[in-house]
Amino acid sequence: MTMYWYNAVDNLYKQDKQKFLKLVELKAQIIKETMAFNIDDYGSTLILGFNPMLWSICKEDDKFEYYAVCTDEHEADFIRNHEDLKHIKVLTDAEASERKFDIVLALDSYFTRFGTEQSQKDMIAKAHSMTNKALITTIKDFKNMKSVDRLIDPPMVINSDSGSHVFLCHREWDKTDKQKFKETMYQLCCGETQGVVIETKRTLYFKQLAKYIHDLGCKEFRISQTQFYKNLFSRSYEYIAVAKV
C-alpha cells in the first residue's frame, strides 16, 4: 500500500506514543545542542514540510510559537487536523513568506525533495529569507558514500506494542542524471508490508549548500562534525548544517 510520509509516521506514533515521543525528543535535543539553543534567545520556529519534530521542538514552553508550512496540501491538512498537533499553526506559503521566524528548520535532507539544481537553490534562498536568526538543515554526505550506501540504508527496527517494525530505504539512481534518484521506504511488520513511501529526490552536496548560503550573505555557516542527525526511520546519519543570519 503506497502512502504518504506522514501516514507512516502517524501509524508508528499511534501504536506506541511513549516510545515515539522519546525517539523524537532525542533528535530534538541533538538539534538544540548543535545550534547552542537557548530558549531566551529564540521565540518562534518554522518547520518546512511535515516532520516528526513537530511533536517536540520547545513544546514545553507556552510562550514559544510553532509554525509549519508545506508544499503539499495533504501534509498541511494532516497537521491541521491532528489532535496532538494543535500547538502548531499551519501557514500558507504566502503567509509564511510575509513574516520572519527566529528559526527555520529544514530537516531530513529537506532540500533533496526539489528535483533540479535551480529549484533547490531557490528553496534554500526562500528558507533563508524567512528567518532573522538561524536556518537549520540536515544533509547526507552523498559525495563520499560507499556504493552500497548509495543504494540502500541499513534497516531500522522499531519495536512497538504491535510488534517489530522494520523500515528499509532503497534508492534507484537515474541513468541520465547522476544526481537524481527515486527513494522507496518499505515498512514491514509481522511478515507483511504495512506501507510504501516513494519520493523522487536530488542530491545536494556540502559545497553546493555552502555556496548557496554564502551567496545569500550569511554571516556564519558551519556543518557539525561532532553531532549527527538520523531520520526517524533510518540508521543512516545526516550532517547538521547551521546558518546564522
Task: Identify the function of each model-found stretch.
Residues 1-41:
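Conserved class I S-adenosyl-L-methionine
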Residues 39, 83, 131-132:
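A generic alpha-to-beta junction signature in SAM-dependent methyltransferases
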Residues 42, 100-101:
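Local beta-strand N-terminus motif with an aromatic residue
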Residues 46-96:
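Class I SAM-dependent methyltransferase SAM/SAH-binding core
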Residues 102-120:
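A short SAM/SAH-binding and catalytic strip from SAM-dependent methyltransferases
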Residues 118-135:
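A short glycine-rich, Lys/Arg-flanked "PGG" loop and its adjoining helix->strand segment in the class I
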Residues 138-207:
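SAM-dependent methyltransferase
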Residues 200-245:
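C-terminal lobe and adjacent flexible extensions of AdoMet/dcAdoMet transferase-like proteins
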